[in-house]
C-alpha cells in the first residue's frame, strides 16, 4: 500500500550539520526582543546626550537611560532581566554619560530589589509598574546625590535638583511604557503572573 502525503511520518533522527546551529523560532523571538530592548536603551542614550542635555528645567535635565533600564526590569521580571540590567548599566557607565562607576551596582541592585517586590506582592499593570518605577528612580537619584555629596562634588542645596531630575524622568516614563510593553509581548508569555 502506497503512503499518502498526509499520513504520519516519524521524525528524522538526525538533522543536517547546519540545522543544528540554526536557532529555533522561540530563540529568534527572544533574540529579537532583547535586541529591541537594547536598541531602545541606545536610542534613549543618544537622545539624552544629544538633545535633552540642552533642555534644562529649573537647572536640571532628565535621566532617561536608568529609567528605561528599570522599566524593562519591571516588565520582564527579575529572573529574565538581571543580565540585561547589568550589561545595560555597564554600557551606560562606559558611554561616559553616567555620573560615575558606582551607578552600575546602584541601577542593578535597586532595579532587582524593587522588581522582586513587585513580582512578589503586586500584579503586573501600568499602575504597579509605574509606582515601583517611581520608587526605583527616586532611590537611584538619592543614591547618586548621596555619593556626590559625600565626595564633595555637590552641595546639600542641590538635593531638590536631584528630586526634580527623578520627577522629570518619571514624567517621560508613560511615553516609554507602551514601547517597552509592545516589545515585551514578542515571543509570548513564558508564564502568567
Positions of the model-derived regions?
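Terminal, non-globular segments
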Residues: 1-193
Amino acid at each position: 500500500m502506497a503512503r499518502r502525503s498526509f499520513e504520519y511520518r516519524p521524525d528524522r533522527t538526525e538533522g543536517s550539520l547546519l540545522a543544528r546551529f540554526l536557532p529555533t523560532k522561540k530563540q529568534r523571538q527572544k533574540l529579537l526582543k532583547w535586541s529591541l530592548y537594547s536598541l531602545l536603551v541606545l536610542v534613549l542614550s543618544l537622545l539624552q546626550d544629544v538633545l535633552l542635555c540642552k533642555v534644562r528645567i529649573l537647572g536640571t535635565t532628565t535621566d532617561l537611560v536608568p529609567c528605561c533600564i528599570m522599566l524593562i526590569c519591571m516588565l520582564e521580571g527579575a529572573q529574565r532581566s538581571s543580565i540585561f540590567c547589568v550589561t545595560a548599566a555597564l554600557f551606560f557607565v562606559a558611554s561616559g554619560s553616567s555620573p560615575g562607576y558606582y551607578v552600575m551596582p546602584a541601577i542593578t541592585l535597586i532595579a532587582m530589589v524593587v522588581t522582586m517586590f513587585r513580582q512578589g506582592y503586586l500584579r503586573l499593570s501600568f499602575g504597579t509598574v509605574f509606582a515601583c518605577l517611581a520608587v526605583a528612580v527616586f532611590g537611584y537619584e538619592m543614591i547618586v546625590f548621596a555619593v556626590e555629596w559625600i565626595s564633595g562634588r555637590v552641595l546639600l542645596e542641590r538635593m531638590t535638583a536631584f528630586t526634580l531630575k527623578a520627577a522629570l524622568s518619571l514624567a517621560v516614563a508613560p511615553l516609554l511604557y507602551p514601547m517597552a510593553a509592545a516589545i515585551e509581548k514578542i515571543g509570548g508569555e513564558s508564564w502568567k503572573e
